């Protein structure tokens, strides 16, 4: 006789939020089921960043009309390089209330959009939480402060690994668990040299990429 497994928590989606939530709950001893609509990505098959346009049937743009009318801001994301990753709105429309307008770039895969972001991971600073009272008087202040979130920044960065960002700069707090930054590239060195002549300080961008094991 088949038995049914009972879970304490069901997490829908394995992206940045769902993945961390599932991991945190499971390590606390809860029985967690993580549901994911997508498949496991195989980097050597699914990423074609270095494939030149002339090797695609339609120079990377896709067959005319293939993707339907893409929402503004999404037209540069979905093409022959990426259509095996992203959900095509024309084929699988976003579920909305009648009359509502909303778009979101979706990627159905284990790990979600953590697979396709640039990994720049600077912290919000104190001013970002208080635009009205501490900046220009516009907008509304958040009901929380940077100090409220700081312990969670520390925990998250220690978990996922953060390179660079170990030095604070105006309204950009330092990462306390930062790994060494990657070596600067040629263009970055030129910018750093020019900034130094102007008396401007440059720091490495915090990246969620491991610079050492």
Give short role names for the model-derived ranges.
Residues 122, 157-213:
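Active-site/ligand-binding neighborhood in enzyme catalytic cores
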